[in-house]
Swiss-Prot record:
This is Solute carrier family 2, facilitated glucose transporter member 4. Its main location: membrane. The modification Phosphothreonine is found at residue 486. It comes from the Eukaryota. D-glucose binds at residues 177, 298-299, 304, 333, 396, 404. One of its GO terms (cellular component) is membrane raft. GO terms for molecular function: D-glucose transmembrane transporter activity; D-glucose uniporter activity. It comes from Bos taurus. Signal peptide: none annotated.
Length: 509
């Protein structure tokens, strides 16, 4: 266990770091169960594509009757399948607009709890679609599970970011992405023909997404609400004190409350902002642009094109068993996300994001070369595997985990919910565009499709290098000061601390 996970005693009057308590572990685990579902439903639609399309055709024939014109037209089937993939993102786009409203109205924990109703509804519709001979039910189920995931994509990083100690905020924030990629990997494994990816069992493959929802409904009531939300937003000192005691394991949290009172006093001049107020705010324009571009760098990097269509990409690259190669990419995905958990508090957010973008750009160029030379050099199929594995690995070093939690770091308590909504909508809009349009772009551009992503990745690298600040080890107030141009705060020595502990000046300064 890294040393950062241990409680560090006070030295020279410096407040101790918050140790990792059982309550903190339970709260983070319960929250990221939502991210696990998010990832599962990204990956689950890929492997069983052919058997689901066959089911669509059977439904079509059943509705036409024996005197009908025959099998479903290829163009109609392509459209139905693209809609089945992309409607997930439509649900996410719509629900992401509600992140700020719901998180302020219900609170972070209760919002995640009630969100599970969408997961249960979506999973039930998808699981019963074959029995009901209705591809509309499957598409509608994908919409509801997408709406669930859209809320999850904002609520989970917000909750984890607000309960996490500053010195672990990056590592715990990265667990959100680790849960997503673990969900993708589980979906890829269960989607094999030897598992649930068969003509008979694919409804079960899609329907079991209700299981983590039910588990989260059991665990979340045992977890504390965000003390920042309770005290700063709801002005509930008693419940906030109780929540702090459970999260920190400290009997005396008076200094923590003093810090929250000071932050609340400052934020009284910065009321919670609506979406329109945030978009019109000159003060928050720069961090908002950064938040949006970081979300674009995640989605327009091409990673979802790889996951949505990985099997067909490996087939076109000449790989004999593309489903297993896809699972290999999922394993790489998970391993390198785990690596980023340990790197993010050492190397920093900005450095890892730059490294990831540069590596992905190189792998995209390598993938283009491999696809161009495949017919003349059969060994290029192996190069394509290396390129995709490298592409996935570099994604999980930076562009995968960083954008999700850095948005919560760039904004103070007042504008944070609205900022999460804007960033989430940007992410889901790009997700939809890739899911709906990649196949058409790939057909038009052929082997050069990944060159397009390489150009975009280069642009995102330049933007990150020029505009994105480092947030590692800084409190929310210190990060906010970057955009308010307060040099005195920027020049402060970054000391180990937690967002839920005393932030006052060091006695020796």
């Amino acid at each position: 266990m890294p040393s950062g996970f241990q409680q560090i005693g006070s030295e020279d009057g410096e407040p101790p770091r918050q140790r990792v308590t059982g309550t903190l572990v339970l709260a983070v685990f319960s929250a990221v169960l939502g991210s696990l579902q998010f990832g599962y439903n990204i990956g689950v639609i890929n492997a069983p594509q052919k058997v689901i399309e066959q089911s669509y055709n059977e439904t079509w024939l059943g509705r036409q009757g024996p005197e009908g014109p025959g099998s479903i037209p290829p163009g109609t089937l392509t459209t139905l399948w693209a809609l089945s993939v992309a409607i997930f993102s439509v649900g996410g786009m719509i629900s992401s607009f509600l992140i700020g409203i719901i998180s302020q109205w219900l609170g972070r924990k209760r919002a995640m709890l009630f969100n599970n109703a969408l997961a249960v509804l979506g999973g039930t519709l998808m699981g019963l679609a074959k029995a009901a001979a209705s591809y509309e039910m499957l598409i509608l189920g994908r919409f509801f599970i997408g709406a669930y995931s859209g809320l999850t994509s904002g609520l989970v990083p917000m909750y984890v970011g607000e309960i996490a100690p500053t010195h672990l905020r990056g590592a715990l924030g990265t667990l959100n992405q680790l849960a997503i990629v673990t969900g993708i990997l589980i979906a890829q494994v269960l989607g094999l023909e030897s598992m649930l990816g068969t003509a008979t069992l694919w409804p079960l493959l899609l329907g079991i997404t209700v299981l983590p929802a039910l588990l989260q409904m059991v665990l979340l009531p045992l977890c504390p609400e965000s003390p920042r939300y309770l005290y700063i937003i709801r002005n509930l000192e008693g419940p906030a004190r109780k929540s702090l005691k459970r999260l920190t394991g400290w009997a005396d949290v008076s200094e923590v409350l003093a810090e929250l009172k000071e932050e609340k006093r400052k934020l009284e001049r910065e009321r919670p902002l609506s979406l329109l107020q945030l978009l019109g705010s000159h003060t928050h324009r720069q961090p908002l642009v950064i938040a949006i571009v970081l979300q674009l760098s995640q989605q327009l990097s091409g990673i979802n094109a790889v996951f949505y269509y990985s099997t067909s990409i490996f087939e076109s690259a000449g790989v004999e068993k593309p489903a297993y190669a896809t699972i290999g990419a999922g394993v790489v995905n998970t391993v390198f996300t785990l690596v980023s958990v340990f790197l993010v508090e050492r190397a920093g957010r900005r450095t890892l994001h730059l490294l990831g973008l540069a590596g992905m750009c190189g792998c995209a160029i390598l993938m283009t070369v491999a696809l161009l030379l495949l017919e003349r050099v059969p060994a290029m199929s192996y190069v394509s595997i290396v390129a995709i594995f490298g592409f996935v690995a570099f994604f999980e070093i930076g562009p995968g985990p960083i954008p999700w939690f850095i948005v919560a770091e760039l904004f103070s308590q007042g504008p944070r919910p609205a900022a999460m909504a804007v960033a989430g909508f940007s992410n889901w809009t790009c997700n939809f565009i890739i899911g709906m349009g990649f196949q058409y772009v790939a057909d038009a551009m052929g082997p050069y499709v990944f060159l397009l992503f390489a150009v975009l990745l280069l642009g995102f690298f330049i933007f990150t290098f020029l505009k994105v600040p480092e947030t590692r080890g800084r409190t929310f107030d210190q990060i906010s000061a970057v955009f308010h141009r307060t040099p005195s705060l920027l020049e402060q020595e970054v000391k180990p601390s937690t967002e839920l502990e005393y932030l006052g000046p060091d006695e020796h300064d």
